[in-house]
Curated annotation (Swiss-Prot):
Protein's name according to its UniProt entry: ATP-dependent Clp protease ATP-binding subunit ClpX
PANTHER family assigned: ATP-DEPENDENT CLP PROTEASE ATP-BINDING SUBUNIT CLPX-LIKE, MITOCHONDRIAL, ATP-DEPENDENT CLP PROTEASE ATP-BINDING SUBUNIT CLPX-LIKE, MITOCHONDRIAL-RELATED
Residues at which Zn(2+) binds: C16, C19, C38, C41
A GO CC term attached to the entry: HslUV protease complex
BP GO annotations: cell division; proteolysis involved in protein catabolic process
Keywords: ATP-binding, Chaperone, Metal-binding, Nucleotide-binding, Zinc
One MF annotation (Gene Ontology) recorded for this entry: ATP hydrolysis activity
Binding site for ATP: P121, T122, G123, S124, G125, K126, T127, L128
Family: Belongs to the ClpX chaperone family.
Record domain ClpX-type ZB: where: 3-57
Length: 425
């Protein structure tokens, strides 16, 4: 639509070339070569494109869902050991996204949601498994700490803030958020303080479990856009949490004793009594594999909450050999990460085998699992990383067992000299 003259002189009233509205009827008019488009038409075009993408995207992604074997294989690249947990997760995640892509109801049968509960000691790989799954599937991922959550109306973090964080990860794209994965850590810390409900309010225990129930099962969560504070006049984003996969994790210290106690209940006195031999007690990891919902109720989780987490799996405590593998084998292993950092300074970093063994031993003694490996390596290499950028001609840094034990400094090998020097020289 050509410009129309309004009044005398150079005053021209401009019109949108698409809808015909004047510049006074719209908020903004964008100019192009001899044409104009208003903000309302731009928004309308965006809506049309979004709707078309929604129709095309599911068809494109139908063939992209990896099989359980492919998911397991990808997890193998980043997570050492935990074969049973990886198999359980691969199947549960595959079924969840198959359900999303084919609808909740198939041939008249409603497909239930497969949220997951991971049990295992600190540093056994619970968080890494969840992160790796999200990265493989290219879906938004967020973590929450159950210990910071409280019931609505109390000081602390509201459970709906979890969905807020997920939206932030995908620029408040609701469709993307609804395909996301939420990992809630330290879930064992919100267990009820005793088997009997207390008269007093337990705002960080059973109360949080009650608050999480609907969120995990599936509800329409109202979240303020762009992180704004809630107020009555504000439009909320509506997020359907029934499409979000929730993975809850915790160490569940002492749960093995609950399982063991159940295994020995019902035994009588006399000849039929099973003798409890401490030398024949199963390891904690083996006991966790035998967990039943009733054990989790005894531990302090309410039955309704356990019912929303139908997939239960446990992770074993990592052995010294597994920790050495973690240091060396995964695609993003610690030794490879630090070697890449040193390569940016044109320096090669070498960890000798006895150094890896010493790091694993130290992590085992600290009982921090794989999580403690980085802090050990960081402390060992701190002085070297501080000095190296100011030094020249260092071609290689070697770390051996004595360095890990604090008896010596890393060995520096120079280009210009055949001799070796330590960082302290």
């Amino acid at each position: 639509m050509s410009d129309k003259q309004s009044g005398d002189g150079d005053n021209k009233l401009l019109y949108c070339s698409f809808c015909g509205k004047s510049q006074h009827e719209v908020r903004k008019l964008i100019a192009g070569p001899s044409v104009f488009v208003c903000d309302e038409c731009v928004e309308l075009c965006n809506d049309i494109i979004r709707e078309e993408i929604k129709e095309i995207a599911p068809k494109q992604k139908q063939d992209e869902l990896p099989t359980p074997k492919e998911i397991h294989s990808h997890l193998d690249d980043y997570v050492i050991g935990q074969e049973h947990a990886k198999k359980v997760l691969s199947v549960a995640v595959y079924n969840h996204y198959k359900r999303l892509r084919n609808g909740d109801v198939h041939d008249g049968v409603e497909l239930g949601k497969s949220n997951i509960l991971l049990m295992g000691p600190t540093g056994s790989g619970k968080t890494l498994l969840a992160e790796t799954l999200a990265r493989l599937l290219d879906v938004p991922f967020t973590m929450a700490d159950a210990t910071t959550l409280t019931e609505a109306g109390y000081v602390g973090e509201d459970v709906e803030n979890i969905i807020q964080k997920l939206l932030q990860k995908c620029d408040y794209d609701v469709e993307k958020a609804q395909r996301g994965i939420v990992y809630i850590d330290e879930i064992d810390k919100i267990s009820r303080k005793s088997d009997n409900p207390s008269i007093t309010r337990d705002v960080s225990g059973e109360g949080v479990q009650q608050a999480l129930l609907k969120l995990i099962e599936g509800t329409i969560a109202s979240v303020p856009p762009q992180g704004g504070r809630k107020h009555p006049q504000q439009e909320f984003l509506q997020v359907d949490t029934s499409k979000i996969l929730f993975i809850c994790g915790g160490a569940f210290a002492g749960l093995d004793k609950v399982i063991e106690q159940r295994a020995h209940t019902g035994t009588g006195i006399g000849f039929g009594t099973a003798i409890k031999d401490s030398s024949n007690k199963s390891k904690e990891g083996e006991l966790l594999k035998k967990v039943e919902p009733e054990d989790l109720v005894k531990y302090g989780l309410i039955p309704e909450f356990i019912g929303r987490l139908p997939v239960l799996t446990s992770l074993e405590e990592l052995s010294e050999e597994a920790l050495i593998q973690i240091l060396r084998e995964p695609k993003n292993s610690l030794t490879k990460q630090y070697a890449a950092l040193f390569s940016l300074e044109d320096t090669e970093l070498e960890f000798r085998e006895d150094a890896l063994q010493a790091i694993a031993k130290k992590a085992m003694s600290r009982k921090t699992g794989a999580r403690g490996l980085r802090s050990i390596v960081e402390a060992v290499l701190l002085d070297t990383m501080y000095e190296l950028p100011s030094m020249s001609n260092v071609s290689k840094v070697v770390v051996d067992e004595t360095v890990i034990r604090g008896e010596s400094k890393p060995i520096l090998i120079y280009d210009s000299a055949a001799d070796k020097k330590s960082i302290s020289e």
